């Protein structure tokens, strides 16, 4: 198992370094969840204890209080160049989307404004293929149009470790260092490396958050897993999907693909 984690770590660090070398200026998106926090940890390893790019939180104002407290604490501890990008109100999102997806689409609009204003050519994002069916169609380096749109039918091939090395004219690329990781990989790596996490991931009074999102579209699951060891043991036996607590994911699969096609993470 340690060999598997070492291989995943080495690949992720190589992807991060390549992105910084090929696509500057680069930013890193941080939701404060376990995956993007693990990505920041890997970036610190890649650059000898520092993160040499801005770390961006797309802020809807709807995160749980514990998540904001974690953000502020870790930003100080790791000396992050944290940029908090306020997302536009929900009525700026596509009105034809279902209600929960429309709430999530605020982050798409916030990211679009950020990229247009600050000129980033690449954004590092901590998504994984196994967490959602539409994300399973992604690439490690994913080209985006000028408006951030993603075409699932026009993804570049990635054979034998080859990834895209050019940025589309007027567009940007999303770089996904954790794409091949699983939920269990992230938790095992978090345990091995003692990476900080939001306490809400651990059970209290029979409930915990398996996936963290905005408080208006995320609910906790029933669980007694009050430690990372217990979370790993729980995941080794569960058949429930990771995002079962995300109300957005109970809308149609087509809704999430529309969100991602429009530029959502």
Spell out what each predicted region is.
Residues 1-265:
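Nucleotide-activated chemistry modules centered on ATP-dependent adenylation/adenylyltransferase
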């Amino acid at each position: 198992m340690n060999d598997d984690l070492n291989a995943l770590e080495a690949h992720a660090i190589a992807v991060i370094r390549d992105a910084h070398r090929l696509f500057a200026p680069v930013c890193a998106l941080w939701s404060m969840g376990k995956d993007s926090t693990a990505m920041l940890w890997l970036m610190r390893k890649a650059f000898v204890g520092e993160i040499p790019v801005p770390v961006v939180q797309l802020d809807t104002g709807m995160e749980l209080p514990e998540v904001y407290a974690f953000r502020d604490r870790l930003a100080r501890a790791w000396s992050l160049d944290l940029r908090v990008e306020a997302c536009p109100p929900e009525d700026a999102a596509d009105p034809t989307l279902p209600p929960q997806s429309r709430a999530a689409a605020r982050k798409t609009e916030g990211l679009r404004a950020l990229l247009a204003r600050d000129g980033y050519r690449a954004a590092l994002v901590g998504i994984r293929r196994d967490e959602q069916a539409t994300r399973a169609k992604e690439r490690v380096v994913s080209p985006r149009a000028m408006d951030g749109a993603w075409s699932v039918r026009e993804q570049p091939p990635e054979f034998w470790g080859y990834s895209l090395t050019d940025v589309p004219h007027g567009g940007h690329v999303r770089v996904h260092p954790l794409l091949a990781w699983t939920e269990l990989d992230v938790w095992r790596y978090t345990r091995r490396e003692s990476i900080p996490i939001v306490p809400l991931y651990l059970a209290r009074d029979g409930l915990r958050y398996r996936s963290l999102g905005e408080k208006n579209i995320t609910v906790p699951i029933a669980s007694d897993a009050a430690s990372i060891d217990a979370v790993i043991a729980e995941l080794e036996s569960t058949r429930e999907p990771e995002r079962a607590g995300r109300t957005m994911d109970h809308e149609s699969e087509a809704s999430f693909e529309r969100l991602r096609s429009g530029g959502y993470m």
